[in-house]
Amino acid sequence: MTIDHSVTNTEQLEQQNPAIKTKLKLKKLKDQVIVITGASSGIGLVTARMAAEKGAKVVAAARNEEALKELTDELKEKGHDAIWVKADVGKEEDVNRIAETAISTFGRFDTWVNNAAVSTFGHAMDVTVEDMKRMFDTNFWGPVYGTRAAVKHYTGRGVPGALINVGSLFGDRGTVIQSTYASAKFALHGWTESIRMELEKEQAPVSVTLIHPGRIDTPYNEHAHSYLDKQPAHYRSMIYPPEAVAEAILFAAEHPKRDMYIGSQAKAIAMLGALFPRLTDRLMEKIMYHSQHAERPSNPREESALYDAGCGMHDRGTNKGWMRSRSYYTKATKRPIVSAAVVAGLVAWAAAKRCR
């Protein structure tokens, strides 16, 4: 066999399988089947509705069967294609069943969104190891199982697909009171970066995106397992709508993106933590204790969504802060030149603060 040495390894791979490109080309949403975990409330619920409005076929997964039925009925009444799968993402067999149901119904899926998550509020030494392990089942192992199912499907078909993991600003920077949540998100961020590099090295047809939300107005705090006397809440802080996260997720479903930050707050904290770690420690020690709870008594721990499904079909929480209607930073990141200018501005601001 004659080898054309003028052709690179990447080009040879592309010739063998035209679907594999150095820059993957993802389908338009109107031509996609999208799997969304944690779809019964908050970010997942808003993303499912928005994806359906853009023409995607939706596979909604969560533990709350009643909410899933209500959601899919709502979408079908509007003329959209949607199915639901009751699943606990902390169980690998349930995650595999989500993939199998999507494939048996629609023949494939094109985007997989690992969104399901829950939090525990309390001082690190107060939270039981049992509760910590349960949170990792949902927040870390769930995305791992989802990643494996998605990558297996995309590589098996040889057609590009998107894997989108929803992280957190606390996956870039630890915080007080939510130590276990931050640890699970740190693990998810490390997993996402590692699997991305391996897949890129293998020229696998998978776009891997990590979403970094700031504080979002969802029932996240109402679902939390709380050891605090006062109710967890986004309090006295900048709060973004779940639509801003959904827009970022769906943008990444069509356009390969490495990272997307929701809110300049999320990006600024990540940068400050990397550039000035001790200063950031001090700032967060001073601010975060008081900005993560409201003044009312905490909900009973048994009402949390850590072990059982939380209330469904609610996209907003009961947070009190500076509500933003959108994230201008997220919109800017869709345009690389504008994004670079914003980042440069943040760096200059951080440097100026240091010099004072």
UniProtKB/Swiss-Prot annotation:
Q: What is its EC number?
A: 1.-.-.-
State one Pfam family annotation.
Answer: adh_short
Instruction: Enumerate the Gene3D superfamilies for this protein.
Output: NAD(P)-binding Rossmann-like Domain
The positions flagged as active site in the entry are Y181
List ligand-binding residues for NADP(+): T37, G38, A39, S40, S41, G42, I43, G44
Q: Which UniProt keywords apply?
A: Oxidoreductase
Coiled-coil regions in this chain? none
- For the ligand (substrate), the binding residues are S168
Does the keyword Oxidoreductase belong to this entry? yes
Which InterPro entries is this protein grouped with?
A: NAD(P)-bd_dom_sf, Sc_DH/Rdtase_CS, SDR_fam
Q: Name one GO molecular function term.
A: oxidoreductase activity
The record's family statement is:
Belongs to the short-chain dehydrogenases/reductases (SDR) family.
NCBIfam families from the entry?
PRK07109.1
By what name is this protein known? Uncharacterized oxidoreductase YxnA
Gene transcribed to yield this protein: yxnA
